[in-house]
Amino acid sequence: MKPPITGRTVVAGVAGQPVAHSLSPLIHNAWLAAAGIDGVYVAFAPDADRFEVFVDGLRGGAIRGLNVTIPFKEVALSIADVVSPRAEAAAAANLITFEADGRVLADNTDGVGLLGALQAQAPGWRADAGPVAVLGAGGAARGAVAALVAAGAPQVRIVNRTLAKAEAVAGAVGRIAVACPLDAAAQAFEGATAVINATSAGLSGSPGLDVPLEATPETAVVMDMVYKPLVTPFLQRAQDLRRRTVDGLEMLIRQAEPSFQAFYGANPPAGADVRALALKTLEGRAP
């Protein structure tokens, strides 16, 4: 039986459109139950054009904070009263918290999730060991590039079909980042310590990325931010080439950890195997 929600229950959640598929409530509520914390985490689906109104209604302290997903990450950043350096660098917020005085604080934990997943599933990998290639030039790519630069990557190669978009992302972080057209992916992969897919290609049966992963060094790590399916065509190709791989579910869990700390003032309990719970849920949703 779930514990009752009381006047002391700490409420947090995730806001997106759509959001019914989100695994965040499963992850956070499992941690809450394991830790014995009087808290709850729920999903919200605000109208796509009324997110600011939705957030303003929460400034009075109704909830502790929100994780923010598509399509609200950029607007969440724009309406915040205080913006963290991580969110500013990523040009997007995936975490907002509400202060007692009504202020909204914006942060971005995607980079924490990215680096945490790489460290967990590719032990020994280091951001500062060599160039890293990032596929895509959207919000997820911006967050990845910012995190990699902050972690000491000597060069980040942004590979995108539309070169101008890659150039815009590269320009935001300076000379460490370089833009590459998609048809030059093989050159971008040469010598890379990691190749990271920050696009939605391969999600839920959509076409996967057709890129020359065989151009990567044998020691390279290949990561996909997509977690449904867990092993995307991109990761399957990497595994066929005997490259180490990192999946998007691990990133989701790792980026949730600092959010849990911000909402509930505690670290996620080590004994809660939220990955196993999430995998079971994903298997149940498989077509």
Swiss-Prot record:
A GO MF term: NADP binding
Residues holding shikimate: S22, L23, S24, T69, N94, D110, Y227
Disulphide bond pairs: none
Keywords in alphabetical order: Amino-acid biosynthesis, Aromatic amino acid biosynthesis, NADP, Oxidoreductase
Top class in the EC scheme: oxidoreductase
Cross-referenced InterPro entries: Aminoacid_DH-like_N_sf, NAD(P)-bd_dom_sf, Shikimate_DH, Shikimate_DH-bd_N, Shikimate_DH_fam, Shikm_DH/Glu-tRNA_Rdtase
Pathway: Metabolic intermediate biosynthesis; chorismate biosynthesis; chorismate from D-erythrose 4-phosphate and phosphoenolpyruvate: step 4/7
Highest taxon, organism lineage: Bacteria
One GO process term, biological-process aspect: shikimate metabolic process
A Pfam entry, by short name: Shikimate_dh_N
Catalytic activity: shikimate + NADP(+) = 3-dehydroshikimate + NADPH + H(+)
Cellular component GO terms, alphabetical: cytosol
Active site per database record: K73 (proton acceptor)
Entry EC no(s): 1.1.1.25
Family classification: Belongs to the shikimate dehydrogenase family.
Function statement: Involved in the biosynthesis of the chorismate, which leads to the biosynthesis of aromatic amino acids. Catalyzes the reversible NADPH linked reduction of 3-dehydroshikimate (DHSA) to yield shikimate (SA).
HAMAP family assigned: Shikimate_DH_AroE
Assembly behavior: Homodimer.
NCBIfam families from the UniProt entry: aroE
Protein name: Shikimate dehydrogenase (NADP(+))
Source species of the chain: Phenylobacterium zucineum (strain HLK1)
